[in-house]
Design a protein with these regions (language model features):
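Long, contiguous binding/interaction regions
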Residues: 2-89, 97-197
Length: 197
């Protein structure tokens, strides 16, 4: 990934008038690109792997909706730039998507610190997530957040193995109340390989 695709600045973004005109097309392109950057885990959670383009789309959309000007732009860049992979990591938004509020509260209350027990397994080696340190995602009562921002920091040999399409790559958690594993498809792997350079 070229260095210019590791950090977004104002010159990467469309002005609101242009974005408004092109929004429908841009959103279709983003949906298509995200298709192979998504992995479901168990009955309630999904990983959405981020990159320069997903974060750029998120910032554009937030600016379009909230119209907060330069101050908002600074805040959005500060919030989303750290979620762009740096070339030796994968970055994911890990979401628990539970519609029923009672079920959601019950599940999240049983999953304290799940963010610290989440991993990608490459060639038998677990790479545990490093949560984004913006705020604690598990509160004092042990209830976790429904949204986590996770960095999976790879060593060179992990990247090499990940790029081998014959190598099985899994994602999962070691949490006692959510011991699920998913195998990444070759389509997902092919999309995520582009995050390494």
């Amino acid at each position: 990934m070229p260095i210019e695709q590791k950090k977004i600045d104002s010159s990467d973004l469309l002005d609101l008038t242009t974005y408004s005109k092109e929004r429908k097309t841009i959103r279709k392109e983003v949906v298509a690109m995200k298709k192979n950057r998504r992995v479901e885990l168990g009955p309630h959670s999904t990983f959405y792997f981020e990159n320069f383009f997903t974060m750029k789309a998120q910032i554009q959309e937030m600016l379009y909706i909230e119209k907060g000007g330069d101050e908002q732009l600074r805040d959005e860049l500060e919030a989303y730039n750290p979620l762009i992979p740096n070339g030796s990591e994968l970055v994911a938004t890990f979401m628990f998507e539970i519609d029923n509020p009672l079920t959601r509260k019950k599940v999240l209350s049983s999953l304290g610190n799940v963010e610290n027990k989440t991993y990608i397994k490459v060639n038998g080696n677990k790479i545990f997530a490093v949560p984004e340190n913006d705020v604690d995602r598990t509160d004092n009562s042990g209830k976790t957040s429904s949204v986590h921002f996770l960095h999976f920091k790879f060593e060179d040999h992990h990247v090499k193995d990940f790029k081998d399409m014959d190598c099985t790559v899994e994602i999962g958690t070691d949490h006692e109340h959510y011991p699920h594993i998913s195998v990444l498809t070759n389509e997902v792997k092919a999309a995520l390989i582009k995050d390494f350079d």
